[in-house]
Amino acid sequence: MSSNVPPTFTELLSRCTRSAIHLEMRDSYAVDYEHGPFAEWRAGARLDPDDRASWWRPWLDLIQETVGRGVVVRRARIVSEPVSEYTKFLYDGTFTNVAAGEQVRWLPRRRASDIALPGNDFWLFDKQTIHWNHFTGDGASAGGEVSNEPASAKLCAEAFEEAWSRAVPHDEYEIH
């Protein structure tokens, strides 16, 4: 059953003690906070891995603190190939997630055809609490939803682990 007054995402991550897994299944997102960086990237701007001060942000502090507490943070991205322009943008910036301690893998969608996947992207905390990420057809955020439904948590955990086992680590994945 979903909560009427869900905790914030930061609270969920802060309460997490063992694992935080994130499955992304869209080829494009239109979330507000990425409009500027995506436009700059499309114009040719790239982050300089050696200039940490230019790209470090509060999100990365949160991930670094979480990993520092012993929580394993993993993200799997299921992507169509050839990848979308937006996926190229994500790929180019993923080194920041890795620098914060997040493990990231990429799964070509063709290799995910026989995986039973939930209908929405999600975060799953300690194999129990789900934060569903809802999006509009155009990729804008339509809000989140928190659930502790055991069957849904099991589906998410199993889908993620199967995707993770087939996915390519970020440092080995080549954009196609």
Predicted segments, located by residue:
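PLD/PLD-like phosphodiesterase catalytic module centered on the HKD motif
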Residues: 1-176
